[in-house]
Amino acid sequence: MKMVGRAWKFGDDISTDHITPGRYYHLRSNMPELAKHVMEDADPDFMKKFRPGDFIVAGKNFGMGSSREHAPLALKIAGVSAVIAKSFARIFYRNAINVGLPVLIADTDSIDSGDELEVDLGKGLVVNRTKGIEIRVKPIPEVMLKILHEGGLVSYVKKHGDIKI
């Protein structure tokens, strides 16, 4: 699975409240509306700059805070191709895989906002086309790659009946 888009960079400790601000929680049953507000508390102009297919890039502990699955789902519905970070909160990481949002662990120091990236999930590689460098990502376990390729856990189970680990 290859994806190309621009990077939008954030720092460490981006919480689920930064991703989906609590004041919009009443929209949780209307995910397309909630998705219009992703990252608003981290960057009020994010959705004005972002285009579907772009990537979110961050430092350590992305997705910390509450365990609500609305955060990764809203990112996916907004059109985020993948989140690339130095590390993720464990619950966010699993929720992202379960909703079909690729999450990649990599050194993000050489990526800046606006850089054009090419991500190859199968090869575990991020190419920063703007800077002409390759960044290896921590391999995604095979079962998780299969879930991502099906669009999430529910789609995977509907198609295959169960998960063989």
UniProtKB/Swiss-Prot annotation:
Any GO MF annotation of the entry: 3-isopropylmalate dehydratase activity
Protein's UniProt keywords contain Amino-acid biosynthesis: yes
Domain of life: Archaea
InterPro entries on file: Aconitase/3IPM_dehydase_swvl, AconitaseA/IPMdHydase_ssu_swvl, IPMI_Swivel, LeuD, LeuD_type2/HacB/DmdB
Keywords: Amino-acid biosynthesis, Branched-chain amino acid biosynthesis, Leucine biosynthesis, Lyase
Catalytic activity: (2R,3S)-3-isopropylmalate = (2S)-2-isopropylmalate
Pathway annotation from the record: Amino-acid biosynthesis; L-leucine biosynthesis; L-leucine from 3-methyl-2-oxobutanoate: step 2/4
EC number of the protein: 4.2.1.33
Protein's GO biological process: L-leucine biosynthetic process
Function: Catalyzes the isomerization between 2-isopropylmalate and 3-isopropylmalate, via the formation of 2-isopropylmaleate.
Similarity comment text for this entry: Belongs to the LeuD family. LeuD type 2 subfamily.
HAMAP family tied to this protein: LeuD_type2
Assembly: Heterodimer of LeuC and LeuD.
Cited PANTHER family: 3-ISOPROPYLMALATE DEHYDRATASE SMALL SUBUNIT 1, 3-ISOPROPYLMALATE DEHYDRATASE SMALL SUBUNIT 2-RELATED-RELATED
Protein name: 3-isopropylmalate dehydratase small subunit 2
Organism: Archaeoglobus fulgidus (strain ATCC 49558 / DSM 4304 / JCM 9628 / NBRC 100126 / VC-16)
Taxonomic lineage: Archaea, Methanobacteriati, Methanobacteriota, Archaeoglobi, Archaeoglobales
